[in-house]
């Protein structure tokens, strides 16, 4: 391990502040759009120890991580690890992180609503989209209590 003077309590990667005491894999998973599996893949590709605390990463290692996140295909990250394969508009495999991911998801939901697909209708009505039951769960509004019958 590096000396204590190289330790950072907060590390900023891809616009996200990460607690320096987390292991590298779990620290990277704090970034929206990066899960634990992709974080292990990043560590393996860049030769970073996944068990090392993220606060001990050098500036050069952080720069390489950010470069990989912005262009994963250049580092031979397999397409099944990316979170937006065969994009609706471009047809390319992409990996989105942070605010860009949130924007694209909202755009997808709006497109579903516009074409009035089943999923879009469910989103528009505020109901569950993925086939879950709705009879008893997911109820909104105030609860109506049951009163005991008076004699």
From Swiss-Prot:
GO CC annotations, alphabetized: cytosol; small ribosomal subunit
Keyword RNA-binding: yes
InterPro entries documented for this protein: Rbsml_uS13_C, Ribosomal_uS13, Ribosomal_uS13-like_H2TH, Ribosomal_uS13_archaeal, Ribosomal_uS13_CS
Family membership noted in the UniProt record: Belongs to the universal ribosomal protein uS13 family.
Keyword annotations from UniProtKB, A to Z: Ribonucleoprotein, Ribosomal protein, RNA-binding, rRNA-binding
NCBIfam families: PRK04053.1, uS13_arch
Gene: rps13
Subunit structure: Part of the 30S ribosomal subunit. Forms a loose heterodimer with protein S19. Forms two bridges to the 50S subunit in the 70S ribosome.
Functional summary from the UniProt entry: Located at the top of the head of the 30S subunit, it contacts several helices of the 16S rRNA. In the 70S ribosome it contacts the 23S rRNA (bridge B1a) and protein L5 of the 50S subunit (bridge B1b), connecting the 2 subunits; these bridges are implicated in subunit movement.
Designated name of the protein: Small ribosomal subunit protein uS13
One record GO biological process: translation
Entry GO MF terms: rRNA binding; structural constituent of ribosome
């Amino acid at each position: 391990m590096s000396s204590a003077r190289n330790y950072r309590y907060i590390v900023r990667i891809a616009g996200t502040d990460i607690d320096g005491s987390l292991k590298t894999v779990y620290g990277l998973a704090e970034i929206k759009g990066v899960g634990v599996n992709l974080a292990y893949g990043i560590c393996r590709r860049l030769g970073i120890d996944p068990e090392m605390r993220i606060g001990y990463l050098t500036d050069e290692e952080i720069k390489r991580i950010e470069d990989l996140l912005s262009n994963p295909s250049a580092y031979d990250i397999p397409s099944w690890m990316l979170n937006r394969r065969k994009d609706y508009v471009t047809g390319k495999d992409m990996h989105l992180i942070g605010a860009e991911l949130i924007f694209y998801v909202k755009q997808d939901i709006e497109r579903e609503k516009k074409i009035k697909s089943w999923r879009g209708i469910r989103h528009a009505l505020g109901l569950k989209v993925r086939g879950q039951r709705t009879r008893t769960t997911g109820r909104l509004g105030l609860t109506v209590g049951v009163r005991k019958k008076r004699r």
